[in-house]
């Protein structure tokens, strides 16, 4: 009998113990990277590198064409198949060195990448800002933790088109910039993710807002505290059951970060990033609209004082949230994003209409919104073929996605 | 923004009850009468023996699945209902059918087996073709999925008088996968290797001719059909454990 009990107990343990998800490690160039001896590029030099590039060698993995786009901290390369590069860049004299990693956002593929731009192949032009050279980037990439040993060569084809460069198109990343399930090095809905997401091509973020037992709005997606999003700890059940002091003291996100309050997150976004759109996705926060909108108003004033051109909208995903907003005095002047019908948008004078992408392009309704001075976004679109169609055939002002680098690719390659 | 249904486990509080049932049932079964002529071969269903010609047998039960946390998020959990059928044919052949459902996602499979035995060891090989149909038209969604799959499979088994052990492996190929949302084709994929599964099954007499099947299966797959409504774009293999409790009717 004991043997049988042990037998079934072991099976039980196997069943519940074999589902360990992983994080994809970021390959590092190591302490001997040449970048330690280089100098940073100027802003004008960085702009000269932005553009559409042809992949001469390496197209089997990265496609035949990529875009290079500088963000606040890094040079990002986006492919049309969900792969992207995050590169550190520096110069020595007129030679430009790029070192970093590539990652496949749809799977766990990753590897080191090391490239350079020689003096005569665009380096001099980039550093001096004069002359006409076609930029050629030569280098190699690796797979996993191996050293880069496979050839990767890129040739600049053109600058971004006026349509792509001049239009204010919002590339909104889900969960403050990326999901934990995307196996990024930082946790979703954390300050670290807000600081990280620009490397993925994001220009704005969606964050999930909940309210503590003592009325403090904070960022967290799931309905309960769980090991998908947090480290094992003493608290369990709905996060809203706890006070902010309890959450702050006892809960750490899956990569060790603290859960941020909404105010911390918005302050960080305004002060420390170039993100220009924040969508506050209200998660079961019945009756808390006044609290959230007062923080929103204060943060918009803070942004204005800093000279930051940023949109912060409170989300209206349900009729319950719509009614909550209507209960706030002066609700028609509160910047909001309504996921419901265009009539609901008009009823609360939302700044943004955001239908689910599966409802179609709806170009006529989008145009109506534009004519009324509103923006139109759609959510949450992840398949490359649909991202391409919505960018090339649609009139939306932006897309909410889990794969901002794919949206960036299709947006910046528009002719 | 993703209020979706996925399969999951029944409440964990029920698991000890199942385990208790199996353990106590096993204990009772071992006290069977010495004159008892019971042979597990005849009523077993997962065991790869040659099924009796023109015989038909049905088992029904529940599958409890633990989808990976990458996919699960806030999904509502429900066990899958499973009905398994065997129909004996001449020349060591049999036909096996299987229905699995969580209402919004359903798989129907059918395939032949050919089996051999040597003393207490048995072996069979088969090929199942499955069709999945899923539909979710609640809470503002209008999503559908249709999938054709192939499951070439091998089983080996060893039997005692009242107990049979079966190890079964199958490869999983997706022939065609079509998912639509709001009338838009979200994805169409064809002809890809999707992974494999390895399952262990214990068939145990509880009393008289009543047999219980306990199964533990690891689905190592990229696309796990019951989770179609998540429209995942991940191109990763996941270990998806599946616990089954079935009763041969």
Annotate the PLM regions:
Chain A
Residues 2-10:
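Sec-dependent signal peptide recognition
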